[in-house]
Each structure stands twice: as structure tokens, then as C-alpha cells.
Amino acid sequence: MQLIANKTAQYLIQNEYHQVSLESDFLVLSSRGSEERIPFNVWNGKVKLKRGLFWGGLQFFAHPEEGKQQSWLIQGLPWERCRYFARLAVASYQKWHHHQCVQLNKFLPEWEMEVRGFERQPAFLNHSTVNAWLEKMNRDFLTMEMTLEDALLRMPDRMSEILPWIDDTDEVMATRNQRWMVTELENWKVLFSQIESSPLNLSQQQAVLLNDDNNLVLAGAGSGKTSVLTARVAYLLQSHLAQAEDILMLAFGRDAAEEMKQRLENKIGLSAEQVTVNTFHQLGLKILNQVEKDPVTISPIALDDNLKNAWCVDWLKKHWMTPTAFKRWQKHLQKWPIAYLAGDDELGSHVENPKLIAWLNKQLNQLSAMGCTKKEIQQRLVDHNDYTRLNSELALVWPCYQAWLDMLKSEGHIDFNIMITKATQHVMKGKFKAPWKYIMIDEYQDISPQRLALVKALCQQKDERNCVLFAVGDDWQSIYEFAGADVDLTTGFAERFPHSTIHHLDTTYRFNNQIGEVANQFVQQNPAQLEKVLQSHKEQKAKAVTLAPSNTVEKILDELNRKAKSSQTVLLLGRNHYHKPELLSEWQKQFALLSIEFMTCHASKGKETDFVIVLSVDEGQFPARVKALHIDGALTQSEDTFPYAEERRLFYVALTRAKKKVWITYTGSGSSFVKELTEQDYPVIVKK
């Protein structure tokens, strides 16, 4: 049915609506030259009759939005038919509304049951469970040809229970899981009080109970991450969430893996005997040996740095015997020196130069780790400001990479990088079926893109097994970019793993609050670092960080030795090996109550000591001078553009090795780090 104004009325009302009709679930309004279709889910079902001197009008209303209500007025209509049309339109709307409610009533009870099930579930509620329900709801809405907004308008009271789970999913889940956690903490208080020599604190206990699809526990220096990993294994086993065979623990070094095995044996015992504790290399080898017919052999050359360097020397000697290759190197080095070498006539005498060979080995390792074609590498580099130089470098080292692959193939061997890549491919193709339901990674901040690809492949195998990733690490201590680690994989965890929960351990048992205040404030100057609170268990009012001239190191040691009532440990930390003091051996003999050791800041990671003296925090030394990026650096460069980002994290690592006091020594006015600590609001002592 339709109503239309006569020609006189149309002339008088100009461009206003002059015609209305009903068409299926729409009101169709027409004016001169245009038509508007108003669906019933936009109209609120109300219509107002308006009587004029000669004609009638109908006003239809939309649902109110933010306190405002839109309406549509059709004028110049024959009055005697307006009431009938209005009744017919309202009846059509009510029929449509009833049909929508009947449709909703088919699905609502199931939705309500799911939501109530979320609340009652006696376990951590993970994102994948809720997301599966949300996806099903979307399919239900498509089946009903209805939107969420329609459902809210049809049955607002019934939908009020469900709406928060749709609009504020993460917040509602977090609140629900927090309520569950309160009960679960009480259930497991005996385990948490006895698994270590001291009871776990609340943030550690909460970390143990996390069971989202992907979990990241940010564990600041000295916050007890190892205790969390051990307690989590005990919790999974004792709660029957997992059998020992369901758990894989990954570490980055053989020593770390052995230490973890020993802890499981000491703290949990036989029930944890079948937990798999591997390095990434052991895991890769396990996968390859299970999938491939022939035994896999790692090249002896790849296993030994000295043999690898010797291989690089041998290759370079042969390569430079080809005039075109030698000239290519000369031409490049004349424009862009490498390892302080220029392309002069004496270049041939540098074929065994340790720095040049170390550089070549580093580029070879990076190309091998990526496993890309030359064209793919060029695509990765093409937007770099130094593309011309980097592409020229690639031309130098690509033949070395090809020779390396040829050597491995002829010997029937592989290297670690090929092993990780092949293992990942086997998992992705389904040739290796992962038996694990829980994958736990220690020192996650040290992970590289290649290793993460293997972990993701294991977690994402499509079968009935839900695999939970539990990563423990600290982006503040990510200091191994030169070895392929990518801090962005930690700071971007939530973006990389959308179904995730991030939690942080809030108490350090290593250093006092005075060291903590300096170190935590310093590392968080970089806004790319994940923000977290790290309180110190030990509190004191006296400042514990002192800046002093480099020539006072012996005086500091003498004072510590005189005040010591028992043996004390002292770490002398340098940015590089050449910062090792010449008098170290004398000091070790001279100060009997001090156990003095020198380390680079990198080597000190994971260590703790009574006192730390950071040496030579001078301009160009610490932070180290920014050097031109080579292929390895350009291919692994972090997206973080904050000045000296990794050097700042390295300085944080150095400061947080100490339990009691830190001295930062420098010459002259020191580096930018010294200036920042002395000129900005840091609780430090400055000695002249």
C-alpha cells in the first residue's frame, strides 16, 4: 500500500517527502527526485498523525540515539487514508517485531547458558573459549538476519546479561578470572608456601595460575622467575591439568636446561621426570630425527667457533684468488671500510685478519638463520637508507653463504639454523605431531624470529589439543640483538598473540629500593619498554648508587675491604673485554675479604653479587658508539628508534646485578648516561 500527495500539495511542499509506501520490512519515502528506504530496525514502530487545513501528514520516529531522535515527516497526504495507513504500518512492524523476538528466543537460552557456564567454569577462562562463543553468536545473527543492535532493541532485559561479554570482553574476562583466582589461590596455598624455601608472593602465585591461550610473565631482575616456572609445573601436575608428558620447557642454553631439569627433580621429584626440558637445538634435532629417515648430523664446523673461523679463512683465500672477486672486495672497501680495512693493495695480506673473519662469520650466520633467497634479502633491505652499501656487502658475502650450503650438502650435514628452519617446516606440514599441551619458555626476551616461528607452529597445529604458551622474560633485559634476539617479539607480544594475558612479577628479592629506583626509572625512559612496577623486598633510606671518577676504583675496593666483616663479592663490569683493569690480579690478592671478578655486562646477565662497579662509563664507551649497520644489523634492526635503546637495557642489567651498592665510574664528564643520572632527578650520590 502507498499514500501519495496530489499534485497541488506536491507543488506547495516543494522538496519535502510527499509519498510513503510499505515494502516488505521497509518504509519507502519519496520526494521530488529522491527516495529513502527506512528499514524496520531503524524505525521504532511509532507514527504520529498530523492534520492540516487541507491535507494530513504522517511522522515516523527512529530509535533514540545519545538523547536525540530522528524523524521523517510526509506531508500533503489524503487525511481520510492516513489513519488506515498508520494502523497498517504499525501492524506490519509488530508482525516483524514478533518474528524477530521468536528468532531471538531460539538462540538466547543457549547464549545465556554459555555465559553462565563461563562464570561457573572451575578453571581459568581463556580467550579462545570466549572467542569461539562470539564467533558462534555472529553466525547466529547472520542466520537470523539480525544485528546485535536489533537484539538489544527487541529484548533489552534479556540481552543485558550477555552484552558486557560482547562489548567489554577483556575487562569482563579479567574480572571473572580474578574472582576464580581468589578461590584457586586458597586451594593451592600449601603448594605455594612449600615449593620454595620461602613462600611465593602474590604476583608469583597469580603467574603460576595463568592459563590463557598465550601468557607472558614479565619478570624483572631478581623477581623469582625460576620459582614461577618450577611451581607452575608442580601446579599443572598436581591439579591434573597435565601429565608430565604434556609439558615442554624450552631454554636457550644447555646449562640453563640442565639447571631446570635439576630443579624439577629436587623440588617436584619423580612425577616431573617425563617433563621434556630442551634447548631449541635439542628440540629441533628431536623433530628432525623423528621425521627424517636418515640420522641428522650437525656439522662439526658449525659446532666449533675455531673451526668455523678457519673455514671462513680458507674460503676467503680461495675466493680472493679469483681476480674479479678480489677487485669487487677492493672496490667496496675503498668506499666503505669493513673491520677497519680499506681496499688498498695490501688487502691480500689481511685474509686472516681476525676482525674481518669475525665480520664474515657474523654475516654468514645471519644469512643462514634467515634461509632466504638473495632476492628476498634485497627486498628486506631495499627501503634502508644505506641500501647501496648493504647491497654491495650482500654481493661480497653471498658467495660465502652459497659455499657454506654446498659444503653442508656435500658432507650430508646441517647447521643449527637449517635445523630450526627444517623443524618448523615439518611441524607446519603436519609431519611432526607435537605431543605437548603446555609449552613454557624461559628468558623469552632472547627469542629470535626463527625460534618463535617454530614455537608458533607447535602451538597452532590444528587438532583437538589446545596448546598453552607460557613465556617468562623481561623486555628490560633484552640485550642480545647481535645474536638474533628481537625485543619487539616481547614488547609486541599482545599484538603477535591476540589471545593473550600479560602479567608481571612485582617484587625483586635481589636489590634494595634505592638501586631499584635508579635502575627502573632509567630503563623506562624509553617509552617502548613495557611499563611495570618492580618493588624491592629490601627497603632502605640511604642512597645506594654512587657516581665516581674512574681513578677511585681502588679506593672503593679498599673501603669495602676494611668495612667487610665477612667475605663479600664484587663484580667489576665493563662494556667490553678491554675494560678489564690491569690491576685486577693485584686487587684480588690485596683485598682478602673481597671476592673480585671482572665480566662484560653481557656476560653478567643472570648473575648476582653484593657490590657492582661499572667501569669506564665514558663517551663512546658506554653507551657504545653507534656504528654503521652491516647486513646482520640491518636485517635484525628493532623497530624501536629510541637513542641507545639496547645500550640502556644493558646498563640496566649491569646496575641490577648488585644486592647492596653500585658505583658508576667515569673519566671527565662521562657519557650521556652519566650526565642523565647526575643532571636529572635520580637518587644518586655524585663524588668528584
Label the predicted regions.
Residues 216, 224-229, 233, 499-501, ...:
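Helicase P-loop NTPase motor core
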Residues 294-391:
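ATP-hydrolysis module of ASCE/P-loop NTPase motor domains
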Residues 17, 23, 29, 37, ...:
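P-loop NTPase Walker
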Residues 1-20:
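Anionic N-terminal interaction surfaces
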Residues 22, 26-53:
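Phosphoinositide-dependent membrane-docking surfaces
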Residues 565-567, 594-595, 605-667, 675-676, ...:
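Conserved helicase C-terminal RecA-like lobe
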Residues 128, 136, 141-150, 154-156, ...:
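Conserved helicase NTPase motor core
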